[in-house]
């Protein structure tokens, strides 16, 4: 481990994180039906080569090959009981390359299920994360990164797992192009003040989701006002049509251009996510490391502090939610939207459902055409 904690280094200069592990593994002929996390045990030399490439590119921190090393994700490969072993192996491999020069960042990704009804409980998620965190700590990780999270409740479970094992952590969310997660969480709701019993993060973070241009637009006002330093790791973005060709716009030079913008608005650590690799990191490191400290002035009116209200319990959200929370039997009937503008037949069907005590009707989105009826309750 480096002599100076990561939390101290980010006060002095911008820290360079590495690129995507999965992208590099795929480019090295590891098919996507393989459990990438298991390669830390079966092919450690391959993982070390990728870490070494990022080290030579100028990264200050190496992220472990353990993103999906939790019991729920590993169950798909019949490896649910190997979460601790694979997490520890991933950290050990990264530490061998990092030595005492670089930081080892232990990657912990989501469990892949909704937290709450229909998925796993917050306690189950915390227990799964704690297993992975323990392995990463024992393998030599310096800091945990809870990355690509979409649900605040799941992030809080991850933070509690880090607290169990006294590990510093980075809390990183992923945003869609409209500025929210797939579960509708905004930046402000996701990074609302933490409960008093939880330790503060080393950094907040944004990773994956969108490319650098879109991400800058979404987070540039949050970064300078954030209560904690911010890490930014955009992905390579989506391809765009240029002269009838599909082209990925995020070249190393393009990523670096936006990395400089992120630093100018106050980001204290920069790296890459899906679609980026050592070439991107080399270009980025050469430009960003020369910037040293950057002063950021926050302009515009400041928002008054709002009282954070606890989310309502499930049974209070709606009559339907009350039935689900109570374990009552519910009935859903799907009614397909009409092909034209006449809703008479659709309303007749809905009336029949109501008369026969159907709990809820479901009007599906049309994946092959524009829907004529909104599936949202108005």
Which residues are covered by each model-predicted region?
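Domain-level signal for soluble alpha/beta catalytic cores
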Residues: 1-378
């Amino acid at each position: 481990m480096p002599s100076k904690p990561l939390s101290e280094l980010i006060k002095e200069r911008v820290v360079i994180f590495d690129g995507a592990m999965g992208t590099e593994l795929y480019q090295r002929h590891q098919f996507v039906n393989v459990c990438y996390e298991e390669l830390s045990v079966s092919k450690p030399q391959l993982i070390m080569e990728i870490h070494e490439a990022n080290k030579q590119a100028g990264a200050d921190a190496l992220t472990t090959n353990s993103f999906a090393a939790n019991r729920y994700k590993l169950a798909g490969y019949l490896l649910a009981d190997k979460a601790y072993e694979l997490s520890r192996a991933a950290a050990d491999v990264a530490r061998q390359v990092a030595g005492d020069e670089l930081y080892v960042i232990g990657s912990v990704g989501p469990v892949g299920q909704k937290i709450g009804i229909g998925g796993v409980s917050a306690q189950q998620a915390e227990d799964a994360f704690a297993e992975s965190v323990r392995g990463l700590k024992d393998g030599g990780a310096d800091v945990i990164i809870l990355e690509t999270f979409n649900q605040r409740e799941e992030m809080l479970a991850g933070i509690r797992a880090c607290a169990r094992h006294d590990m510093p952590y980075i809390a990183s969310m992923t945003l869609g192009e409209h500025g929210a997660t797939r579960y509708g969480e905004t930046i402000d709701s996701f990074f609302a003040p933490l409960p008093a019993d939880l330790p503060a993060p080393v950094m907040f973070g944004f990773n994956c989701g969108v490319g650098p241009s879109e991400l800058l637009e979404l987070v540039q006002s949050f970064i300078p006002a954030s209560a904690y330093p911010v890490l930014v790791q955009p992905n390579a973005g989506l391809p765009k049509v240029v002269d009838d060709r599909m082209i990925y716009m995020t070249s190393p030079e393009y990523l670096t251009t936006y990395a400089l913008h992120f630093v100018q608005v106050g980001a204290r650590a920069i790296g890459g996510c899906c679609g980026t690799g050592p070439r991107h990191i080399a270009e980025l490191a050469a430009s960003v490391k020369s910037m040293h400290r950057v002063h950021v002035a926050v302009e515009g009116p400041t928002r008054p502090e709002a009282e954070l209200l606890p989310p309502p319990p499930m049974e209070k959200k709606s009559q339907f939610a009350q039935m689900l929370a109570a374990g009552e039997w519910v009935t859903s009937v799907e009614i397909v939207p009409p092909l034209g503008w006449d809703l008479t037949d659709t309303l007749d069907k809905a009336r029949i459902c109501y008369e026969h005590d159907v709990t809820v009707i479901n009007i599906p989105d049309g994946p092959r055409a524009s829907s004529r009826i909104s599936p949202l309750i108005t």
